[in-house]
Amino acid sequence: MGKRLLFAWLAGLAPALAGAPLPVEEVAPGVFVHGGAQEETSAANRGAIANIGFIVGSRCVAVVDTGGSLSVGRGLREAVRARTALPVCYVINTHVHPDHLLGNAAFVGDKPQFVGHARLPAALAARARTYLAALSRALGPAAGMTPLVPPDTSVQDTLILDLGGRRLELRAWPTAHTDQDLTVFDEQTGTLWLGDLLFVERIPVIDGSARGWLQVTGALRGLPVQRAVPGHGPVTVPWPAALEAQERYLATLVEETRRAIKHRLTLQQAVDSVGLAERGKWLLFDLYHPRNVTAVYTELEWED
């Protein structure tokens, strides 16, 4: 099916399949966030495991991430419609991970611009089949048909979006959590949407560079932010104090992995010993920490 025909089909299907609105919290005037479950995707949560939401201007609405399934995206769209009749003009994806963008197709009928980091389309194309297979395993029949909708507007450095009396600054970052991380800053309220550049309570996941993430964290710390919306955790967190636990975890991994390599520990020995003092401080630690150590070991093994 061609892209144009697929979009037309989705646009016609969406109203018929609209469900209940996702619950959202207004964390600042015109800024609404749905708090994702601190879990892995399952049939019970439908992939609603990330913080997603929308910002309302005087002219239109920008959606920031759309959730981990078409069903979640539809619920978010219904939440928008429950609060405003203004059109959705932008759907912004903060990075490639499926819990943040598999709901994009729910908004195709609104004919928005889909916006993401310049490297997002290639990353999504490379992982599409894997993501959809994983969704089918997790949700079973509830996964249904979840078409992937890539961005049609890319951010190389920064981009300003005007919602009507309300400007959003989008910024593309160097490799950190992933190699396509994007933040969204609402100038009116000083609210910074970080995507997965910030995990709170749930263990950070390294799919880019631990060293790069620490460098980006230093740059983020200096931004004039009133409140922050992390990709996972409470819907808003104090700034910049919320960065501290994640920064400690990443720095610990880098320091201890570097020491393990210096002492000629194998990868498995590093996985079995690095960062274990962090257990008990993070949700899903046992699931993701070994992967993180593996990623950092690979990153540092041949560093100069």
Task: Show where each model-derived region lies.
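Divalent-metal (often Zn2+) His-rich catalytic cores of metallo-beta-lactamase-fold enzymes
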Residues: 214-265
